[in-house]
Structures are given as C-alpha cells and as structure tokens.
C-alpha cells in the first residue's frame, strides 16, 4: 500500500463545533471515515501554522481521493492537500537514466 500525508485546514463550522465540545474525539471520527473507504490511518495530529490537521494514511490513490471528497463535502474541512510518499532514491535513479537520453537542440 502507498503512504500519503494529508494536510488540512478545518472549516469555521468545525471550529465552532469543537469549541462547544472540546473533548470530542476527532481521531476516532477521522479514522472511521478513512476505514470506510478502505484506508488505514497511521497517525493524526493537530498542528500550528497555515494548516490545522495532518494525518498519515495508507491506501491507494482512489481511497485517499475518496476520503478527501467525503471530508470536503461534509463542510468540516475547507482545504485538504494530499502528498504521496515516494522512494526518492528510485526517483533520482530514474532521473539519472532519463538524463542520458536528453538531447539539447543544436548539440
């Protein structure tokens, strides 16, 4: 399974709901959504900065996109970014192979 980092900005609606119920377990509710689409949540953290929430999810691309659509359509999130974890050694190895085939004009 591929691993993805999902970084999100919560909506004002969710902020209001959490202020009314600060002990609500967002980990469990988030985990249920991810499992409903066939994914597995590895970690879930609230962070300071431009975004509010970061979680690590295992699954395929369709699973993670399905989760994203469900959260955005719920109105609880304003923005979600998906970042797939890659093997950078393989990626740069392929870049090195491809570079051997690059032909610049007029050379």
Regions found by a protein language model. Give the residues of each.
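A compositional/biophysical signature of low hydrophobicity enriched in polar/charged and small residues
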Residues: 1-107
């Amino acid at each position: 399974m591929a691993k993805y980092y999902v970084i999100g900005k919560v909506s004002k609606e969710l902020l209001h709901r959490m202020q009314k119920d600060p002990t609500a377990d967002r980990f469990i509710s988030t985990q249920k959504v991810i499992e409903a689409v066939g994914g597995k949540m590895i970690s879930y953290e609230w962070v300071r900065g431009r975004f509010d929430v970061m979680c690590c999810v295992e699954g395929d691309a369709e699973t993670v996109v399905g989760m994203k659509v469900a959260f955005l359509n719920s109105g609880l999130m304003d923005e979600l970014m998906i970042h797939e974890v890659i093997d950078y050694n393989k990626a740069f190895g392929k870049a090195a192979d491809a570079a051997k085939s690059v032909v610049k004009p007029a050379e």
